[in-house]
């Protein structure tokens, strides 16, 4: 905090309550997309501080990670590893595939769309996008819905991917009740 007074640029994640100490701050570049916590000008030492986010920087990397985790869940990887470790070859596992599945992508920005493209390439039966507006999205999406329509989409969903920025609108968008739909 003592050095913060000298900072002109901060990149990464800085607690909003600590920004006032950066008296010379000119630019706060967040290493994530959702910057709602940083939009109140009163948290800065002066109103001229430039705020930017990193929207679009992680689409490929994070979507590939989501794809990997999705496949691990569909193929019951932790159980499979246990079978291999214990040499219990006679045990079989039911494994599911992305091919032929119904996927809902909650958040159709860079990360969500990169995931949808990859899932489409693997043969997903239908990919639904859910976002603020219903405007046409990337061709990877077969159907597009708004956040207000989420409850009607979830019952048709086999795989749900959340790729949302941290904003007031998206905070707590899912609940046990909603997931149970």
Predicted ranges, named:
Residues 2-5, 19-22, 98, 152-157, ...:
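A short, aliphatic-rich alpha-helical micro-motif
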Residues 5-8, 22-25, 123, 141-142, ...:
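Short, well-ordered alpha-helix to beta-strand connector turns
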Residues 6-84:
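Phosphate/diphosphate ligand-binding glycine-rich loop within oxidoreductases
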Residues 10, 28, 66, 103-107, ...:
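Generic structural signal for small/hydrophobic residues in well-ordered secondary structure
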Residues 119:
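Aromatic pocket-lining residues of Rossmann-like dinucleotide-binding sites
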Residues 1, 8-13, 83-91, 139-147, ...:
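Short gly/ser/thr-rich secondary-structure transition/capping motifs
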Residues 48-50, 80-114, 143:
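Glycine-rich NAD(P)-binding loop of Rossmann-like domains
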Residues 133-181:
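Rossmann-like adenosine-cofactor binding region
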């Amino acid at each position: 905090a003592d050095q913060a007074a000298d900072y002109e640029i901060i990149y990464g994640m800085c607690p909003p309550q600590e920004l006032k100490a950066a008296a010379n701050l000119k630019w706060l570049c967040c290493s994530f997309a959702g910057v709602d916590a940083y939009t109140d000008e009163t948290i800065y030492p002066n109103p001229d501080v430039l705020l930017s986010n990193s929207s679009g920087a992680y689409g490929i990397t994070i979507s590939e990670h989501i794809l990997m985790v999705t496949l691990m869940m569909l193929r019951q990887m932790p159980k499979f590893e246990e079978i291999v470790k214990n040499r219990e070859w006679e045990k079989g596992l039911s494994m599911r595939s992305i091919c032929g599945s119904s996927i809902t992508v909650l958040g159709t920005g860079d990360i969500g769309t990169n995931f949808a493209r990859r899932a489409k390439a693997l043969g997903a039966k239908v990919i639904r996008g859910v976002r603020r507006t219903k405007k046409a999205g990337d061709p990877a999406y077969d159907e597009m819905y708004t956040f207000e329509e989420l409850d009607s989409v979830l019952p048709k969903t086999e795989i749900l991917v959340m790729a949302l920025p941290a904003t007031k609108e998206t905070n707590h968008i899912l609940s046990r009740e909603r997931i149970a739909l």
